[in-house]
Amino acid sequence: VDGEKIETKTVIIATGASHRHLGLKSEDELEKKGVTYCATCDGALPMFRNQPLVVVGGGDSACEEATYLTRFASVVYLIHRRDSLRASKIMADRVLANPKIKPIWDSTVTDVLDVAQNKVTAVRLKNLKTGAESELPCAGLFIAIGHVPNTEVFRGQIDMDEDGYVK
C-alpha cells in the first residue's frame, strides 16, 4: 500500500462475477433498451408490460426469470439450445406447466433487432438441429446464461480453473 510491502498469510479475493453475454454486437447496442440481464430489476418496466418477452437459458436462473416475467408479459418465450431444461426438476416442471411460458428448444439467438429503431423489436433464432432461421417478435430479451468471474486481473498469478474461478 503506497509503496509499502505488506505480508499476510491470507488474501481474500472478492471481485464478484458479471453476467455472461451472448456475444452479439446488437446485444451490446441494445443493452438497457430492451436487452437486460435481470428480470426482477427490469421486468416491471412499462416497456415490457403486456408484451411478448424472451428469456435465454435453461437453468434454474432462466426458469426463475421466465416465471417472474409472467406477471407482466403477455407471453414469455424460453429459448434453450438443448431439447430439455438443465434446471432442477421442480423448476423445470413449474415452467413447463405454466401456460404463459412457451419453450423453444434446440435454438439460439443469433441477432437482436432492431438497432435502427434503438429498441428491441424481435430476436433472430437459429434451430441447431435443422439450421432453420426465424424471427420472433418481442419487446425484451432477458439473458440468463450464467456468470463470468471477475478474475482476469489475477490470471497467471493465482490458481484458477479453466472458467476463471479461483481454486
Locate the predicted segments by residue.
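A Rossmann-like FAD-binding core segment of flavoenzymes
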Residues: 6, 13, 70-167
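FAD-site-proximal beta/loop scaffold in flavoenzymes
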Residues: 23, 28-47, 145-167
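N-terminal Rossmann-fold NAD(P) dinucleotide-binding loop
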Residues: 62
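Glycine/serine-rich phosphate-binding loop and adjoining beta1-alpha1 elements at the start
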Residues: 6-33
